[in-house]
């Protein structure tokens, strides 16, 4: 069937900011889809609120709108652009929900916009729990015993019939938001209430729990001629009951018999045909391990996290082909881009095993609720490819960057067996490692199976890994056994530990005996057809399929899994660096292990190695490819931390030299440099023991900021106000990096400024300066950043420019540098310098139209900025005001305190742009998920130190018609200043403030309680209650002032005469 001729312009809705449950996989899918539609000759208009993505680059679509993803804003774009069609299935749940709202409001019909791909009725049939259940019953496909409810009372009526355990699944939500497993009335009431709140349709499915069944997924494609194929089937190692995004997944499935495989395949295809899906679709099934009984759990009628994984696991580009199916092409007329000889209608076959392991944020949120259930908690994931299951699992484990390299925890031997078993029963994020520890102690597989319901196939593989580990000890230095262990994915580091050698000695031993990996191609067809992809994985076999070319090569290190502090911004920079390398005529090679991102799309680089980012795995690739050099400054801290390890092997680090990278990180050397170039920094000292830290803090004077050196995203960084708080910190956090000392700095309150600059060693250019709304002390990744600065004086701007140039030249920067300054009452101070790409690079690149990562890469290759047409210093300003606002995923993480401080907590970001600061802020706040209303009720409860400042804010909010609720102390302060407020009861009393929040009476919460380390503190409960009830809670008064400005600009003030 030829493609549709009745449409010319297509609107694509992106997925917005990165949150838990909706991460970089949609940047990858959306980028692929937009390019596929352009390739077919359509005009593409993209709307997405996330500036950190490749998808929102001007090259990806004909017109890019970075605007809030709300009904009103998208409707404005539709009215302005008059697209012929809308493609809703590539923007995750956000894109789908938007399409449904635009359809229901009549906006699409009024503007003659057709929906492409899967019909809306089909989407609703798959997403609406009631309609889906009815269809399954008609098809004779079993679904778990369940009921659809719209109220808590209905839920309890169903519970009386079937009893616990029950699973609650809210309709039209993403990543299991608001859902969970319930074992008693209290849990049930809380989860159902939450679920109804988070579901846009106020609807939940309550189903009898089938936890313990195997969870199997089929990634399927169908076109309008009813051709349907299975791209990939995957098996969750964790049984049903843990969200698939939080499960360890293996592809292809390992434990299904042929009968089971075919039965579930047939069901998957039958269901997507009945639904009329056109494009990609994910089917989740539950299989009874003891019989052929199965249930269908759910169907995602869109591109999903699993389809990104399936694309990378097979090399089959699902999103690209789904976009082409949406415009009328069929599977039997599209070529598979990997082989370029076979058609897309051929099902991929794999001759390797892939493992996916989720990356959790609990290294940042140590007090977070770690137990896994039906609500997703992982921020990202890693994938690894091997020829055996053991190899792919161990490669995935060492890709996670938890400091864990093996099936066990670093301090595993210190735990007693009782504790280990308790942790296994908890089913939390560390369960896999505790299972390894239990096997080491001789716990039987039967007992572990009883506790976890994990299939014996996998438990036997874990046992095999522990057996090899054990035998390494008794075969110290044995070359054959070394080879055997390498076949099963053991790293040099783990072997070295068992052989009583250093990692270098094992590396040398391998080199001398020719035990080196070969690289195999991922070709979608198990080598049945000729294939032309440059997509490889390493394994210890005989034939190397990665042909080394004569061309000069540059190797770029990617940034690994998405986590808090290291998001998609670094993938963005990686991709741009690769494009610049190719333009300069070099061969670009990427090493990365994140299946969700654009950088691991095989069509981006000349060669992609899907491997762990460790010294050993990267060196193996360098030994084969012999690149001219390696680029580390685009891959975040992951890549920077590998620089010195690679340099030990005489690998050339391109761009800023290793000595200079270390000079920026090493406290003493950095202080010496600042002294030489005459740039001031807050008074600070270095401590190697708790005693020394106390002496330092007393001599500097409280408050002080304490942190370990060499960290990203402010990990383990805190502001402390007293000896007691400091002692508490030193006892908990110094472990954060034992070989590195702790820095103790004077905490300066003032405006925080962030600058990104590019240097070629001679000329320094500054694309832009950003001012933070929150004063220093809030991590730059969690602050609202504004471009251009709104409150800086000209002489401050000149000083910032001057200091930036001095720092870039003083550190001999070649490439990018990111600097944070604070402007205190007595001048400008430098807070920190990062000699690498930062998380603001995409944001500034989009605003200024200076492709910073590409320009930095050209400087690294040796081009001069002056020859490229740039003048030194601050570049000309772009018209308008641009705001970068953080986005948090607190509603997915229980027990996490949302107070902003020096430790980063946001998972993503959005951009708001308009002619004025207020309008840009309104867009930024709206895009971040905050509903900004021009009237309503604000609850204020602030600490003593903030009481003076809250008065003027309350005055302004009162004048635009906001009602004020306040706790006793705050209300007293307001009354002294003639500002009316209603006093609310303390927690636990009658009509207390938590009840007010839960009943939906409050639109904004302002809370700056003194920080108590213990959870029981009222402030913590207030903050959590607001998150769990979807009420914006602001913990920094600077953010409140910004919000007040926006509210004032939307409305009129009412003052009496």
Curated annotation (Swiss-Prot):
Residues 930-1057 form the MGS-like domain. GO terms for biological process: 'de novo' UMP biosynthetic process; glutamine metabolic process; L-arginine biosynthetic process. The gene is carB. This is Carbamoyl phosphate synthase large chain. Pfam families: CPSase_L_D2, CPSase_L_D3, MGS. Binds 4 Mg(2+) or Mn(2+) ions per subunit. GO terms for cellular component: cytoplasm. ATP 1 binds at residues 129, 169, 175-176, 208, 210, 215, 241-243, 284, 298. It comes from Staphylococcus saprophyticus subsp. saprophyticus (strain ATCC 15305 / DSM 20229 / NCIMB 8711 / NCTC 7292 / S-41). Residues 547-929 are annotated as: Carbamoyl phosphate synthetic domain. Belongs to the CarB family. Mn(2+) 3 binds at residues 820, 832. Residues 1-401 are annotated as: Carboxyphosphate synthetic domain. Its EC number is 6.3.4.16, 6.3.5.5. Large subunit of the glutamine-dependent carbamoyl phosphate synthetase (CPSase). CPSase catalyzes the formation of carbamoyl phosphate from the ammonia moiety of glutamine, carbonate, and phosphate donated by ATP, constituting the first step of 2 biosynthetic pathways, one leading to arginine and/or urea and the other to pyrimidine nucleotides. Mn(2+) 1 binds at residues 284, 298. Mg(2+) 2 binds at residues 298, 300.
